[in-house]
Amino acid sequence: MVVYEVPQKNRQKVVKYAVISYSIAIRTLGRAGAKYQKLLDSIRNSTVQPEKVVVVLPEGYSKPKEQLGYEVFVHCRKSMVGQRLAALKYIKSEYTLFLDDDISFEPDFILKLAKPLQEKKYDCSTGPLFSFFPASKAGTIAGILTASVSVSLFHRDMYVKILRSGGWSYHTFDTSEERYYPTESFAWTCFFIRTQVMRNLNMEDEIPWLEKNQYAFGDDRVMAYKLVKRGYRACIVSTALYEHNDAKTSTASTEIVNTTPPYCTGFFQIVFWHRFIQDDEPLKFMKVVNSFCIGYWMVSSFAYRLLKAVLTRGYWPIFNAVMRGIKAGIKYIHSDEYLQLPPIRY
C-alpha cells in the first residue's frame, strides 16, 4: 500500500495514511473574493492534495483572480445543478469533493470525510452544518406546527430524516467525538462522494423541475434523498467541521431574495412530495397517509402564513408567493413534462 507521512505536532510520532484518489469540483460565479481565497488556502493546506481541481463557472462569467495556479476552468450554461455536474466530465478520481466557493476547512478535513467511504460503510459524507437548522424559537415552532421541519424525536441516531409531508426532522449532536450519523439530506455546499455514485444519480433528470423557477430551491434535499432511494448511504462525520462563509453571490436582486424563494418553497414542497414520497410508495395505505401529511402541510402552512401576513407588516407578498407556488406545483405534477421524468429508482 502506498502511504505518505504526516508528522504530529510533537514531532515524536508519525501517522500513516493511505493515498486518497480524489478531485475537487468548485461551483462559483467568480465573485466570492476573500471568501474564495479562504477556500483556496484550505485546499493548499490540506493534508491530502487532490489529483485535480475543476472550477465551473456559468457562461459569460470571468475566472476569479484568486487562483491556485493549476486548476482547470470550465464554463457551462448557468445552472445551479448543471454547474455541479459539469465537473464530472473532467474527473477520473475515485472520489470527488464538491464545494461551493465560500467554504473553508482544516488540513485533516479530507481525511475525516474519506474514512467512512474507505471503510466501505458509506458512499457519501460531509460535515455537520448546524447553521442550516432553524435558529429562532419562532422558526422552530412554525416548522413543527406546519410539519415542515422539526427536531427529531424518533430518529436521534440520524442527522436528518425526510418526513412524509416532504419536510424533514433534524438532530444536533456533540462534535468533539468522532461518530458517523446516517442522513437523508445535507447542505449541498460541501460533500465528498464516490465519483461513480454521483454519476449514477442522474441528477440531470431533476433539472427540468428544480430549475423551473430561476432558483434551484431544495437541490440538496433532492440529491441526498435520491442517493438514499437508489440504495446508497450518506453520513455526517461529526468531527469533520467546516465553515460556510456564505458569499451570497447568487442573490442579485431584492425581487429574487424576497419573492422567488417563497414561491419556490411552495412549488418544491408539492413536487418533491409527489415525486419522491407519493409516487415511490408501493403500499396503498401509506399513500393515504402520505396524502394526509401533505394535506396537513398545505392547510397548516396556509393558516400560519395568513396569520403572519395579518400580524406582520410587509409579509403579504411572501404569503401570496408561497400560495402561488403551491398552486403551480399542483398544476405541474399533472403536466406532460413532469409525467415524462424518468423514475427516481433504477
Name what the model sees in each region.
Residues K38-P50:
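Short, acidic, metal-binding catalytic loop of nucleotide-sugar glycosyltransferases
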Residues H75-I91:
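Glycine-rich, basic loop-to-helix element that forms the pyrophosphate-binding segment
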Residues V81, D157-I193, Y215-A216, I256, ...:
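A recurrent flexible, glycine/aromatic-enriched loop bordering the glycosyltransferase active site
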Residues T96:
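Short aromatic/hydrophobic "clamp" motif used to bind/position activated sugar donors
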Residues D108-R156:
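Conserved donor NDP-sugar-binding/catalytic core segment of glycosyltransferases
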Residues F186-W188, W209-Y225:
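Acidic donor-binding loop at a coil-to-helix junction in glycosyltransferase catalytic cores
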Residues E204-F217, R230-I256:
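Active-site donor/metal-binding and catalytic loop motifs
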Residues Y263-T265, D280-Y346:
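Non-catalytic, C-terminal membrane-associated alpha-helical segments of glycosyltransferases
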